[in-house]
UniProtKB/Swiss-Prot annotation:
Binds 1 [4Fe-4S] cluster. The cluster is coordinated with 3 cysteines and an exchangeable S-adenosyl-L-methionine. Its main location: mitochondrion. The keyword Transferase applies. It comes from Emericella nidulans (strain FGSC A4 / ATCC 38163 / CBS 112.46 / NRRL 194 / M139) (Aspergillus nidulans). Keywords: 2Fe-2S, 4Fe-4S, Biotin biosynthesis, Iron, Iron-sulfur, Metal-binding, Mitochondrion, S-adenosyl-L-methionine, Transferase, Transit peptide. Residues 81-310 form the Radical SAM core domain. This is Biotin synthase, mitochondrial. Residues 1-20 form a transit peptide. The gene is bioB. It catalyses: (4R,5S)-dethiobiotin + (sulfur carrier)-SH + 2 reduced [2Fe-2S]-[ferredoxin] + 2 S-adenosyl-L-methionine = (sulfur carrier)-H + biotin + 2 5'-deoxyadenosine + 2 L-methionine + 2 oxidized [2Fe-2S]-[ferredoxin]. GO terms for biological process: biotin biosynthetic process.
Amino acid sequence: MSVSFTRSFPRAFIRSYGTVQSSPTAASFASRIPPALQEAVAATAPRTNWTRDEVQQIYETPLNQLTYAAAAVHRRFHDPSAIQMCTLMNIKTGGCSEDCSYCAQSSRYSTGLKATKMSPVDDVLEKARIAKANGSTRFCMGAAWRDMRGRKTSLKNVKQMVSGVREMGMEVCVTLGMIDADQAKELKDAGLTAYNHNLDTSREFYPTIITTRSYDERLKTLSHVRDAGINVCSGGILGLGEADSDRIGLIHTVSSLPSHPESFPVNALVPIKGTPLGDRKMISFDKLLRTVATARIVLPATIVRLAAGRISLTEEQQVACFMAGANAVFTGEKMLTTDCNGWDEDRAMFDRWGFYPMRSFEKETNAATPQQHVDSVAHESEKNPAAPAAEAL
């Protein structure tokens, strides 16, 4: 006996699953994509002449289209399965004279953090060995102070740390506040891979967060680092109370530097009790993802690094960021003064989703330029017409 289930439902609710609608044409898709995004997806090399309006066009693209475009750009310039594992150590904690509203290490706020002297060189190198043994390929060191003026002994110790980490075959990055041209050269000669100095936010919003160091002073330090031949690492913090326009402004400023930074850290504010921003809520995930995707598109060859606040994201949210172009994380025991995802946790996540750790210096030693990678993709497409084009939207 046959049974007809459709008779029990009103005719209006019966769906014709066999109906095939006409597919939208490529032109109809393109008409909904901002011109700036179309140009970015087709690009074969980074450009440093983005206008703020163009960055805004990209940032305001509907999120599903934006992340899809970011994934296409990511595959054009990077291995989409490779994630750089970095470990950050505080080599000098607390006692900083600056008034950064988000920072637990400022001496102006009562956060319960005890100031320390600089860690001994041997202790730092041992931490680097542990990080390497656990899979990290970049070791970063941070010191809580305004600048390096009058710190000759400290600079000497930092240079020993840099040389020691490089001898292990690891990349090494430091963040020491403002430095001058001579100090940058000394660090370069010691073997420094990268120098971190975040812009934090847009020029317009910056004075509401920090008053003891100007935006131009930050840009000057980046200039010294770049002129010394050291890779620039510079990004921002999300959730400071900024508007979308400030996230757009940050990315525009970084993209307008003489050359794009080697890495762009995306930090989500971790509210610290006792600081002026201690009662802030974490930024919504859609805005964080939108920032990651925009950074990937506007800074196509740059490493986009998930930094502070990643521990608050679910595994699925982290993977969404990776698929939208993030390709580095901080991992290990701590990230300066805040909690951090651990090595075992991250390796297990990579295994579940098909990612793997980027090798040390992989970005530098890979002989293929972005254009050569594009040519390779095109060649594979000719051999296999079914393969999707990297830039297709």
